[in-house]
Amino acid sequence: LYNQDDYNTNVNSSLIASLPKRKMGVAARLSYDYDHRYMLEVNAGYNGSESFAKGHRWGLFPSISLGWNISEEKFWKPIKPVISNFKVRGSYGLVGNDQIGSDRFAYLAIVNLTESPSYTTGYGGSTTSLSGPTYNRFQNNELTWEVGNKLNVGVDLQLFNSLNITVDGFRELRDNIFQQKNSIPNYLGTASTKIYGNFAKVKNTGFDLALDYGKQLNRNFSIQMKGTFTYAHNEVLKYDEAAGLRPALSQVGKSLNSIWGYVA
């Protein structure tokens, strides 16, 4: 499958905003099912994005999933009236993300030519202010895709042809997360200059439980009940932080968007 997007916003507020947004990608899928017992699916996406510099625009994101319908095996027949369906499955794959902030072409530098004044020199009362160009954002041609490594294992179970139970456990390691660099001291002259890169890493874990009970009591009456439960936890594994930051204020080891404050 080939896909190409060319989206023109017709916005003339700036030169960059007036440029059409473009993406390209190729996707492929291979599925195999043997006797409703053994299932295999392989997917791959090769995607290109305008969000990155030449040499980093394309990313390959494969995935694979396996399933075994145990209840279709011959040895399962004696207990099939009780456990009508029993299937185990698992999947692993990579998922790419090119939505890195609100600015287009974040790898390019932004230079301000009209800053006034830009620089101050001298000491005490003898100072001189001069005008000149300044960087609002430094160039970084190494910006690339955020990548999620996703692992999922699950069980599908049906009891007495009425109660369906689905359990899924998941783990995702999201690497190369887009972030503004905070570890460069202001005295190096970058206090008002933004520097972006793929600096952060986050781990997400959890599980989902779904119950579905249905019963046809007679020709005119049936009952249906459903319920779900989800548990999810995330942890920051890597984050570019200011040098000398107190451990209590560090993002690393804590959940995303943690709240800092006094405990009453």
Predicted regions and their residues:
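Transmembrane beta-strands of outer-membrane beta-barrel pores
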Residues: 2-6, 44-50, 70-72, 92-96, ...
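Flexible, surface-exposed loop regions and adjacent strand-edge segments
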Residues: 12-17, 57-63, 105-112, 182-191, ...
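Conserved small-residue
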Residues: 104, 214-264
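Outer-membrane beta-barrel signature, preferentially recognizing the C-terminal barrel domain
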Residues: 15-24, 115-164, 194-218, 255
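Residues on the lipid-exposed face of transmembrane beta-strands in outer-membrane beta-barrel proteins
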Residues: 28-34, 64-68, 90, 153-159, ...
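Outer-membrane beta-barrel transmembrane domain signature of Gram-negative proteins
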Residues: 1-41, 50-53
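Transmembrane beta-strands of outer-membrane beta-barrel proteins
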Residues: 1, 40-42, 62, 81-90, ...
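Short loop/turn motifs that connect adjacent beta-strands in outer-membrane beta-barrel proteins
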Residues: 37, 71-86, 162, 216-223, ...
